[in-house]
Structures are given as C-alpha cells and as structure tokens.
Amino acid sequence: MPKVVAGAALAGVLLTGCGGADDPAPTGKGGEGGKKTSAAPPTPSGPSVLLTVPPAYSADKGWEQSLAWMPAKYSSKPPVAVGARSGTVAYVNTTEDGYVVQVRDASSGRIRFTSEPWEPPTSMAEAGNGTYDGDEAELPSVSTAFQDGREYVVLWAHGVQGGDALAKGKEVVRLLVFPMDASGSAVAPKRRIDIPVEVYGPNSEKGKGQDDLRVEDYGGGLQVHWNGLKKGAVAVDVTSGTIDACADACAEGRGQVKTSKGWVVSNYVLDLAEMPGSWHIQDDAPPGGWSMMDKSSMDGQYVSTIGGHLLTRWHTEAGGNFSTPLVAVHDAATGKLEASIVCERPRGDDAVSSPNGRFIAAGTVAFDLQRRHGTCLDAGESRKADVLVRSITDDGTAYGELATGPGKDPGAVEIDLSAGDGAPRLLPDGTRVPEWALPGAGVFLTPNPVNGLLISVLKQK
C-alpha cells in the first residue's frame, strides 16, 4: 500500500484493516458480526499512515495494526498493553467466533501468538445491572504482569457471569492468563480466574470514571482495583489462581498496592499511606515539610504507585495547611524515602515509568531515581500550561502533552530528565507522543473519530 500522511487516510486504514486483519466485533458484543477477513501477516509491512512524531522516531519505519472493530465511544481502557521486559505489544482483536489477544514483537512486528477465541462475561449494560445507561460500550481489555521471573499477558473483561430470567448473575472480572513466551495460533490460556467485584457499572477509561476499575501490575504482580459503591483491591497469583483480597490490612484503609512485605493502604480519613503494623509514611518524611506535621495532618497523602515506588504529597512550611506542593517517592515495600521535590501546583496521578525503572512520573512531576532528582512541569511564572507526562524512554527522554483544556490541541513536548534543568521543549504542531516508550521503539495510539484505533509501533532512529 502506498505511504500516506495521517489525516483522512487514517479512516481508510481503519476501515480496510491495512497492516493486519480485523474482523467485525462478535455478534452481541458491540458489533453486528460478520465473516472473517484475511489473516494478519506474521510479519507486517511498514506503516501506511505516516504520523507526525518526535524527532527520535522514524514515521516510516516500524509496523501498524488497526483495530477497526472498536466503537468510537467505549468505557474500558484501550485494549492495548506492552511487555516492557520482553519488548512486546499485546492487543485485543476479533474473529467471528469471539475476541482474541494477539502478541507481537515490538521491534519486528512478528506475531508471537494468537489466543483461541473467547466470549467474555455479559456486559453490565446487556445484563441490565446497575444504573449504567450511557452510550459507551464496555469492551474486553488486556494487561501484562510479571511474577516469579516470568512475564504474562492477561486478557480480561468485566461483566456478569451466569444468571437467567429468574436468578441474578455474579458480577466478576474474568482473567485469562497466557505466558508471554507462548507461541502459535488458537493458544489456550494457562489459567482462567474470576475476581468477584461490586462495581455496579462499566469500567472506566484510564480510571477517569466513577467506577475506576483497573487490572494492572504496579510492581508486585497483577492486581485488580475498583471503586464504585464498594471499593476493593485484590492481588492475583497468576500461576496458581489464588487471590488476596486485602482483608485484614484494608480494615484500616483502602488497599493501594500489594508488595512482597504486605499491603500498602491509604487511611479512610486523610488518605495517608501506610503498611499497617509495619510502617507509616511519616516515619521517613521528606525534607522541607511542615513543622506542624502529625498523623492528623494531610502529610503523606497517597498519589499513585508505579514499579514498586509510591508517590505522595506533603505540606511545606511556606504553604502551611492550604496546599501540598511537596512530592515524594518512597519504596513501596519499606516506606523508605527515595527522592522529593517542591513544585508550585503538582497535578495528576497517572504514573508512568521508563522500561528500566530509572525514571518515573505522575502528571506534572517526574523523577530520576538514580540521581534522586525531581523535575516540576506544572504551570507557573514562566510556563502557561501544565505538562502531563505520558511516557519515558530508558535514556530519560520524557514525552508529554500540554493541559490546554477541552476541545483544544494539547500540544506535545519532550523533556530530558537525565541531566540539566528538565525544561520542556515544544514539538511541532500535530506531533503525537508515544503511549509507551519501549527500548528501540515507541507505541502510538491514534483513535478515529468514527470508530477504530490504529496502533503504530515506530522505530527509534
């Protein structure tokens, strides 16, 4: 296929499935069904849509996969995940027999394996459960996890299992676990696991909705978290299928992350992080904090977890009790302080990490853990808008977007976190930033306003 510049061409690629096969969504699961299209090539040709990308990436070198079956509006997170250790990209696709997960090498695009087709639990809307009556479809999604030295792919969906016209079904998150090193086609999962939940509505994209259902590995193995009417947290052993529902520790707070030493919780009143019976976040407070700090003050508020590191916020002496501009990073297992920085107005809690774990960020605050150095990217005297970090490479190049408000082009920036002052550099208009930065390649997601999602995996120069 001739190479074309992104724009109207994107719609054509998503409609034709160029770069890999795409089947209509299975009947009754968000589509009208239909016959299978041609099989995806084991090694795809280069990108047919040339995106505007940061200068470190080659727009015409790499591969792409279109997910034309996806609706324009959906409540789940995008059905794409990466294996940072294995250098792989996993995504959910469809056949006439059900949903499949497919895994490719990021560097070559070669297909490692395709799962057998699967019909997920009945969605909440179809089951008539809860109060959800919106127009956003709830779709299966995919995550990756690392346990006992091995990486796994987890195909998952939220919905109602069982039930009939008389009896209520059981609300669950169903997990299908595949070893990342599997190979072949129609691969069966090594384990199927049902996690009982009480969300009463659809899961939300990137945790932005009221139910905030997440299936992620925060550095201690796979975990399922949900809010809704009853908040819950479950750690999952993907090899045995056993689950830890945070019963004892969560009597004192909300479960945030399971570590090798126990559960980190945030207490119900002030959201302060602690591991009950082991440590409290204020045991190793960052320098520059408020002299009036105690366990009844909002010092050490939980923000997020990534790669075994906790991010928390604190008061400062200058700010008093009215703001928490001090941001700290702690070891999630021990609570020990690793780095901190004072920013003007830190914002955002979606944490990201470089594949090697040296660099992490949450919203407008980023850290080089090797240098124990922080960078503030919030708006201030010299910056008109917040910079929200989306991804970080192993060499410390962070990519982010300007928080410009609804309906406006966010603008793209890059930041060097490895040295210097970490000042953002504005990229040309229309530049897309990678959703994930893998060694040697960036993964870009481009939604179509009508329907479909284009995955572009582009090589670094």
Regions found by a protein language model. Name each.
Residues 106-108, 180-183, 237-241, 281-286, ...:
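Short loop/turn segments that connect beta-strands within beta-propeller blades
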Residues 11-153, 160, 166-169, 175-206, ...:
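N-terminal "mature head" segments of proteins
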Residues 1-9:
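N-terminal export and membrane-targeting signals
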Residues 110-113, 185-190, 244-245, 336-339, ...:
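A structural motif specific to WD40 beta-propellers
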Residues 324-329, 355-357, 365-376, 393-461:
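C-terminal closing repeat unit and adjoining cap/tail of repeat-based domains
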Residues 323-362, 366:
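Long, well-ordered mid-to-C-terminal structural blocks that present hydrophobic/aromatic surfaces
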Residues 96-102, 161-178, 228-235, 267-281, ...:
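Structural motif
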